[in-house]
Amino acid sequence: MQFSGEGLFFHSPFNSPKKHMFSSSKGLFRGHPCPSIAAGQFCRLLCCPFDHPERVKRESENGSDSAEMVKRRKLEVGQGVARVAGDSSGGKLELPGARQALNQRDRPEIEGVGASPKTEGGRAEGAEKKEFASSQSSQKEQQETPHASATPQASVSPQTSAPPQHVSSSVSEDVLKQGKNGITSKSEKSSVKQPGSRDIYQPSSSREPPVSSIDTRTSSSPKSALEAVMTTSASPSQSRDGSRNTSASPSSSRDAEHLMPTTIFPCPATVPQRIAYLKAIHSALTDKRKLKFPKRAAILEELAAAKRSAGNYMVYTNECRVLVKSIKDGSWRGGKAGGTKTDSKTSGHITSSISNQLDMLASKTKPLLAQNGYPVNPDPLKSGLPSNIGIQHCDRCDKAFDVPKVDNYGSCKYHWARARMGGNSTMPEKFYPCCNQPVGMSEGCEEAPRHVYKLHDLNDLAFVIPFRTVSTSESLDTSTSTSTSTSATTSAPSAKSTKTASRPASTPTKSLTSSLDLEKSRQPFNKARRPRTIFNGPAVNQREPDITLETMKRGIGESRGQADSQERSSEPRERSARVREQPSGSCDQAGSLQTSVVAVDCEMLYTSLGMELCRVTCIDYHGKKTLDRVVRPTGRILDYNTRFSGISDINEPIITESGEKGDSISFEEAHRLILKLINKQTILVGHGLENDLIAMRLIHDRIIDTSILYPDFNPRYKTALKTLALKYLKRTIQTGEHDSMEDALAALDVVKCHLKG
């Protein structure tokens, strides 16, 4: 806005500064002087429709348009628009944009109607635009078919330019309508064409001379130059006969001028910090890669790293460091950020550094397993199902009941959420989050048909269903554990050893295990056979059938003396080493043992034998599902625990990603499938895995538990997986019923985030 003595003037697309803002459209009082000015006073009206001496003087100097000139100008513009609309060649004449024409003080330049005024240097304004438009029209004429219309083009040379004139609002609206119908404006025609995302990562040509870059912050296009670069480049224009116009814009080969990061929300770091990492990425690209647009490539890669960080500074810094390292070592692929996603599905294996970090986390967790309730060494009690467990306390309402007569005790009223301490003045005492009632106020907010219980003592758990130790000898032959009695006898944990399972001396597999251990002790230590990577070989426990079966046939039925004599045979050492290591994991061509990582999550329900396994889910390090089945419990089902297990029917199959139905399996079949996936060297990842291992009745010491990895400030309680996923992954989980696949993937991603920084 601009205020003067005559009133208020407003710069807008629909009002020229030379016109009064509040003058009437018909000019009824244009020739009458203002009464206030005539009386010698100052006009205080902001919408005075009368004439003022200042405006009359200005119009006399600039020249006012008569009614005849206005009518003639309207007629000329209308004829030009009619010629353009009736041109059968598709409208070769170009009209400027309506908004641009209204913003200009002078008459807009319309080809075929008028020309632009001359500048101070004598050169016609817009002459360069006319030359560019004429060259474009000549190229289109060459591509036209012989059947094209021969209507002559209406063009006026720059020498016949008309004096500057005004354009009424009605004419501007007509120009705007015609522009929407296909008449392109010169501002749109001469817009800067930004290079596409594919062109950014093309190698630079030595023949092209360096050109000056464009500042992306001063771009006149609706989108910024960086956003235009991120999207796919526009397809070349097509003529009417279908031929593609491949003429590139003069500015399509220009790089960004400044290294300025793109603003995003939430921002993971400050602008100076992002600029520092952006310069490091650009320096790496300049030193190791010869790209056509190194600055634009650096800006896009830094923006991708900032988006992946989800506002976390530690994740952002690690993403940038990994990106710079991948560019320097040559593993980076332009436009795909392959170096920053080494632990995702885009990568086929994990580097040795990540494998070493996982081993270090597992070794730190191992001393803390016993105090966190993991089954380390339960006493080897006699296996078999008890006839009477006795009096137990309900796991929900804490009432005592007789397990065989549970149906006679009536319903169970309970609170499904744990009691919490009030953190404000409105709730200072303990309360239940499920109903916001203080502790002791009511019996419960939900009701179940019967009471349930859960065994906590490991000896009692081993008495109901025996534990099995995950070891090398367990995966030699899964067919030997078909019956419950045989598997229980051969897999009961020993009190003398916490690493391997205790087997009777009469077991045939014992001689083979002892012979392999003796052969292992005789061979010298070889550093080349140490684990180098994980998940870069075949599937876990994928072994050669001929060698394994032949070895088992030799081991079964032989005594210890026969096994010792067989060790001193002339069999090659390489073959015996391959046979010894094959069952415990996958081996590469060099014979080195591969360490695997499996994320596990189990769901449990209440039965007459306590809490049993009802669903097991296993995924690999890349998030691929390897096992997801519903397990039929051994005891009688008392409660499905649907709120936390997500199971409402034990016979309902699980639909896999391929569309196949996974029917429910028995507990013995679940054991067999689990032992195919894990071995002694496998690292199990999960949250609160002590409950999962107890439900699976497995003893394992290579564990990465996120509840131990991220302890809460209160030692009495552990941090929930939902809290960890929201804090480190910006992911909301467990909004409804628990999903074992969702929980396993969240725990695995939390561990990956911990490895990154």
UniProtKB/Swiss-Prot annotation:
Region ranges (Disordered): 56-259, 474-590
SUPFAM superfamilies named among the record's database cross-references: Ribonuclease H-like
Q: Which Pfam families match?
A: RNase_T
Which top EC class is named for this enzyme in its record?
Answer: hydrolase
Record flagged with keyword Hydrolase: yes
What does the UniProt keyword field contain?
A: Cytoplasm, Exonuclease, Hydrolase, Nuclease, Nucleus, rRNA processing
Q: Where is the composition biased (Basic and acidic residues)?
A: 120-132, 543-557, 565-581
Q: Which GO terms describe its biological process?
A: rRNA 3'-end processing
| Polar residues bias spans | 145-172, 202-223, 230-240, 503-516
EC assignment: the record states 3.1.-.-
Q: In Gene Ontology terms, what is one molecular function of this protein?
A: nucleic acid binding
Q: Which InterPro entries match?
A: Exonuclease_RNaseT/DNA_pol3 (IPR013520), REX1-like_exo (IPR034922), REXO1/3/4-like (IPR047021), RNaseH-like_sf (IPR012337), RNaseH_sf (IPR036397)
Q: Where in the cell is it found?
A: Cytoplasm; Nucleus
| GO CC field | cytoplasm; nucleus
Could you tell me where the Low complexity compositional bias lies? Answer: 244-253, 474-502
Q: Please list the residue ranges annotated as the Exonuclease domain.
A: 597-751
Disulfide bridges in this chain = none
Q: What does this protein do?
A: 3' to 5' exoribonuclease required for proper 3' end maturation of MRP RNA and of the U5L snRNA.
The similarity comment for this entry is: Belongs to the REXO1/REXO3 family.
* Protein name stated in the entry: RNA exonuclease 3
Whichever gene encodes this chain, its name is REX3
